Amino acid sequence: MKEERNYNFDGVSTNRLKQQLLEEVRKKDAVQLSIFELRHKITELEAKLNTDNEGSEWKTRYETQLELNDELEKQIVYLKEKVEKIHGNSSDRLSSIRVYERMPVESLNTLLKQLEEEKKTLESQVKYYALKLEQESKAYQKINNERRTYLAEMSQGSGLHQVSKRQQVDQLPRMQENLVKTGRYNPAKQKTVSAKRGPVKKITRPNHLPELHP
């Protein structure tokens, strides 16, 4: 159960109360301004994290990755076909060897150059895609770090908002404590003075004018 608090400001001058009230209002306005700025920044951060935009960086990276996967699939199919040809039955291998044996030297040299060119092409593609994967990995890590930073800032803004709420709840008791410290408010002394003075007498005034004698 929450503790109920009774606030008594008897004996405090009106000017002092006005000063304290204006000070608390100023603090409250400053807190509300900070809350507004934090909410605005949170909105901006959430907009940056929105991936539904057609031109978003995440979508571009996703499409690039799909293209990269398609190229790798084609290379896998091509290499599988080459492996199947190499690991065929013995009769096929022997027939291929016989074909090469019957080929002239010039044709063999031409075929060798062609195979070397294919090898270089494959090696270049492997290097290209390896570099591409490394770049994509670094870019993803950068975006992920930015996302964590945005989430941390949003969490910090939410925490400050909760602190400002607690500060507003504690404003009134602080006002009374400040008045007591400055000696402008003493509840016990005020009660003693009121007891010495006794009840306040009510002053009555006649409701009619006095009679005039000739």
From Swiss-Prot:
Residues 155-214 are annotated as: Disordered. Keywords: Coiled coil. It comes from the Eukaryota. InterPro entries: DUF4600. Belongs to the CCDC169 family. PANTHER family: COILED-COIL DOMAIN-CONTAINING PROTEIN 169. This is Coiled-coil domain-containing protein 169. It comes from Homo sapiens (Human).
